[in-house]
Amino acid sequence: MPQLATICYIDNGKELLMLHRNKKPNDVHEGKWIGVGGKLERGETPQECAVREILEETGLKAKPVLKGVITFPEFTPDLDWYTYVFKVTEFEGDLIDCNEGMLEWVPYDEVLSKPTWEGDHTFVEWLLEDKPFFSAKFVYDGDKLLDTQVDFYE
């Protein structure tokens, strides 16, 4: 059974808004710096999920743009994750405290030095380089990235 989710990177032109996941117990992302996002709710489109999750986790009203889709086979036991990757450059509002971790604007040149999933380095670079729409698969064994496949669409 697949799990559908979104991950959103909010870009202010010189920094990405990152979430340091350090507040939720038993969090598969504990200690990592990631974008904001979450699981799709029943009947929700990926776009609706991205807008909702951004508002819930950051307090920002945003216009997310879908940049790609990543499959994570068996990312959690017996569950494949299909994650819609969004980039946001249009947003308004003030940041709120997030119950999942600490939000921080991270300069582009520091983003890849933060502790994160190994594969995140790859697709965050694609977002920063404004690569075309992508479909990718990242295969992990625990924290170790075993394989990456990607197709870009012009």
Curated annotation (Swiss-Prot):
Name the enzyme's class: hydrolase
Quote the record's binding site residues for Mg(2+). G38, E53, E56, E57
Keyword annotations: DNA damage, DNA repair, DNA replication, Hydrolase, Magnesium, Metal-binding, Mutator protein
Query: Per the UniProt entry, what are the Gene Ontology biological process annotations, in alphabetical order?
Result: DNA repair; DNA replication
Q: Which cofactor does it need?
A: Mg(2+)
Q: What does this protein do?
A: Involved in the DNA repair system to avoid A.T to G.C transversions. Degrades 8-oxo-dGTP to the monophosphate, but is also active on all of the nucleoside triphosphates.
Q: What is this protein called?
A: 8-oxo-dGTP diphosphatase
Q: Which organism is it from?
A: Streptococcus pneumoniae (strain ATCC BAA-255 / R6)
